[in-house]
Amino acid sequence: MEEDKYRTVNAIAEGLYKEKGSRFISFIYPVKSEEEIKDIVTGLKTKYYDARHHCYAYCLGANRERFRANDDGEPSSTAGKPILGQIISNDLSNVLIVVIRYFGGIKLGVSGLIQAYKEAAADAINHAEIVERTVDEVIHVRFTYVVMNDVMKVLKEAEPDILSRNFEMECEMTLSIRQKDMPRLRERLLKIESLSIEE
């Protein structure tokens, strides 16, 4: 896959795995920040307050630069790690998977737990719509009305997303474009007289 592309999920999806009376309810979320992850996990712990464990793993960044696995009281590496393994083996980024366990009275053992958390995470992934996204960069441009036609010509050819525009005293636009296309867009815009770019 290209460096500025990654795979993620389009929306929340749910999975379920049952083993020896224990139920493992899994959720996969598209996420962008650790703050968002914290809020989701806290919300699920509140909603499923009577569950014994709320284990999770996440990967953030197009190249999975930031990741974490949490066993939430299960034996070390029996829950978070197999969940994380499913995220990585499915080549996903910017996702959180939470698996909630309701204990059924029969211990599963280390290998049983690893298998259960792996299967629960896999089921959530199987129910999710996987999409490809690009890593985009955002810039803010300012220019005068005099060069409006030149700016619009560049934008028509480069096709960035116009996130906002303001044409009052002077013209301002916030633009978003795929990371690999940004140097060319920036170069072409900076050739326009009186135009300035802010990151």
Give each language-model segment a name:
Residues 142-160:
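Short amphipathic alpha-helix segments
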Residues 151-157, 184-193:
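Short amphipathic alpha-helices in soluble, non-transmembrane regions
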Residues 161-167, 192-199:
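Conserved short beta-strand edge segments in small beta-sheet-based binding/regulatory domains
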Residues 129-145, 175:
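Short glycine-/aliphatic-rich beta-strand segments at the starts of folded cytosolic domains
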Residues 1-77, 164, 191:
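C-terminal regulatory domains involved in ligand/effector binding and gene-expression control
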Residues 175, 181-184:
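Terminal, non-globular segments
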Residues 27, 54-56, 94-97, 138, ...:
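Structural motif
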Residues 79-127:
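Active-site beta-strand/loop microenvironment that shapes enzyme catalytic pockets
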